[in-house]
């Protein structure tokens, strides 16, 4: 039962994801992905799977994978200082409160068993967190200084399927070879490199995935009305090459 105090807490938190909580309360997230889930390529059922959500934020995808039957690890960072800030965009003052308040509240309300691990994808290894049958990463890689290293780490963690959904650059996608545009000098969202579609595909192959399938292109709409182009990929490795 959600109390009045919890209702106020939900309303006061800043949410990245729109989550439908027990008793029908809905968080005011920057992105409402509920009607877009079919575009991302999660299996209908994930019973018996061990799944990883890279860059979980409020946990929308982690909780969804758990609902579908998976045992889920959710990866994110607690301290704003540990994020990949471009030097000229780095805040002079950081909040004292740890990130992940929305995730922790939602986990409690859902009665979830998802484990949130405070760890950079750069440092995530099988020795640290094990391997996974299914790895999901959505709208995270574009915010990283070293996208290829992150993909290499994901490939090392994945013993099954990796599903990616990331923003892409339409101009770079026209060029007949893999390129990315540099964005870290812009006074906008924290983005270092915006790859073309071909670039994403080649990076995933370079990182260790033998089969990289483009699953679709779509737009993700924000609460304020603007939208972001995304491209989806499904990646697997050849067992014989492992």
Region spans (language model):
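Class I SAM-dependent methyltransferase SAM/SAH-binding core
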Residues: 60-124
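Conserved S-adenosyl-L-methionine
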Residues: 209-220
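Conserved class I S-adenosyl-L-methionine
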Residues: 49-57, 73, 163-186
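A short glycine-rich, Lys/Arg-flanked "PGG" loop and its adjoining helix->strand segment in the class I
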Residues: 148-161, 168
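Short alpha-helix
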Residues: 99-106, 191-208
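Conserved alpha-helix/loop element of class I SAM-dependent methyltransferases that forms part
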Residues: 26-49
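A short SAM/SAH-binding and catalytic strip from SAM-dependent methyltransferases
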Residues: 133-146
